[in-house]
Every structure is written in structure tokens, then in C-alpha cells.
């Protein structure tokens, strides 16, 4: 599944992106971010991160540097660990 998603991203970068121009407000671009997220986190979580990123890329966003979080910084896992530590 990861291979298919990455192939679709490559197609987008080669065929579609040049027609739209450079509109991304972030570094790396949203398509590069999506590719990295899928490679580091797998198809499901990587797609989720990519969709969140694309939703943040709009004219009212300040943009800037927004790197893919490392695989071991899963906020859900941290939240679940905190919840377990507070159980009686």
C-alpha cells in the first residue's frame, strides 16, 4: 500500500504540481511531507499526518518549517501512557 501511495505522490509532483505552481506555505512541501510521513509511519498513520498537513496549508496559515514527527513521538502513545500512570 505504501508503494502505491508513494507512486501517486510522485505522479502528482511530476504531472499536476508543475501546472499549479509552488503554493505550499511549508517546508518541506506538502507532497514531500506526505511521502516522508508514509515512509516513516506507514500507510495509515502517514496518510493521516499528510491530510492534517494539507488542511493546515491555506492562505491564512503562517507556514514555515514543519517536519514529519519521528516515529517514536506518537502523541497517542504518550497520552495513553499518561492515562495508565494515573489509574488507581
Swiss-Prot record:
Predominant subcellular localization, coarse grouping: membrane
Reply yes or no: does the keyword Plastid apply. Answer: no
Q: How does it sit in the membrane?
A: Peripheral membrane protein
Where in the cell is the protein located? Cell inner membrane
Q: Which UniProt keywords apply?
A: Cell inner membrane, Cell membrane, Membrane
Instruction: Provide GO CC annotations from the record.
Output: plasma membrane
Stored Pfam families: YidD
Location of region: Disordered = 68-88
Q: Which domain of life is it from?
A: Bacteria
Compositional bias annotation for Basic and acidic residues = 75-88
Q: Which family does it belong to?
A: Belongs to the UPF0161 family.
Q: What does this protein do?
A: Could be involved in insertion of integral membrane proteins into the membrane.
Protein name as catalogued: Putative membrane protein insertion efficiency factor
Name the species this protein comes from.
Burkholderia ambifaria (strain MC40-6)
